[in-house]
Structures are given as C-alpha cells and as structure tokens.
Amino acid sequence: DMGVPILGTSADSVDAAEDRERFDEVLEKCEIDRPRGATVFTVDEALEVANKLGYPVLVRPSYVLGGAGMEIALNDGDIKKFMKIINRQFQEHPILIDKYLSGKEVEVDAVCDENGVLIPGVMEHVERAGVHSGDSISVYPPQKIKPEIKQVICDYTQRLAKALHVIGLINIQFIVYEDEVYVIEVNPRSSRTIPYISKVTD
C-alpha cells in the first residue's frame, strides 16, 4: 500500500494462496482438487457446513502459520467447542471447514524463479493427516508413496508455483487419499522443513 516493492513473491500472490475464494480459482485453473469445504465466520455457519459435508471435518483459522488452531471435529459438539476456542485465539480470522480425509499427508518445499521450479524432494508425514504440522514428523524419501503418485505431486507443485508467480520458496501440503492427490494448503514462503530438506538432499 505504501508503494514499496517487495523482493520475492508479491503480496498479491500471498493473498491468493491464503484467501479461500481466490485460491479455489487458482486450483480450478490448475485442474487440481482440494477437500470439499467452505469459509465460515459464525458457529451456525460452521454447523451448517459441517453437516452438509458430513463428519469428520477439519476446522482451522486462515492466515495463520504452521497449522495453528487446527482441529478435527467429529460432531456438532466439537464444532461448537472448537469455534469458541478459535474465535477467542484468532479474532477476525475467517475459519475454514473442510471434509477430513484420513489419508497420507505429504509435504513439498520448492525453490522458484521466472525460469523454473526446483523440487529437492517429497516428504511423507508419519502421523495421520490433520496433526498440527509443528507437532508432526516427516521422513525423506517417502516410504509409502507410489512413484506415480509422487510424480503427480511434483507436477501439481510446478503448476501451483507458476500459477502463483512464486519467486523464492514455497511449501505445499498434500493429502493422498485412495490414490488421489488433494491440496491442503499452499504457503509461498519458507517453512520449518527447509533446513531439514536442504541438508538431506545436499
């Protein structure tokens, strides 16, 4: 807003990755699926969406780091409890409600510029999907991901990095469910796994 240029990925691209409606447009353009879901602001909206999707659902605030505030809701009581907690901790943040897929969570860090996208490796989470990323363990190389699924993940990473015009680092979290790949979220920035993946792929 102050007219000062930002090095690396633009603020607009960061917003496109964080804003639900804009990110859905990016995914549609890239022909990539994500778990069904919606953005809500109130408990009543959350209950309506959760019952429409069917339990379990993933509840999390948007525009936060590392999956903070993320919870898996199994019923209406969980929704009411988690919405109260999230609204108290993350005031004025939209809340995302997604269908919970009990698949294998996979993570990718990549380095991008106008000439291409470098993917050092694909990391597989040990814990079930939905565990706070700061509390999870990942392994490299992935142990239970089929080569063809890994190729799809790399292809999706390329598409998303280019569509968002990322300059620098990007972190993408995927879920592999019944041999289908879904995007959970995209963070056009450095992640906690950068030091680890830079060492093990050196």
Regions flagged by a language model, labelled:
Residues G37-T42, I72-N75:
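Short acidic-hydrophobic, aromatic-tinged amphipathic segments that line or gate anion-handling sites
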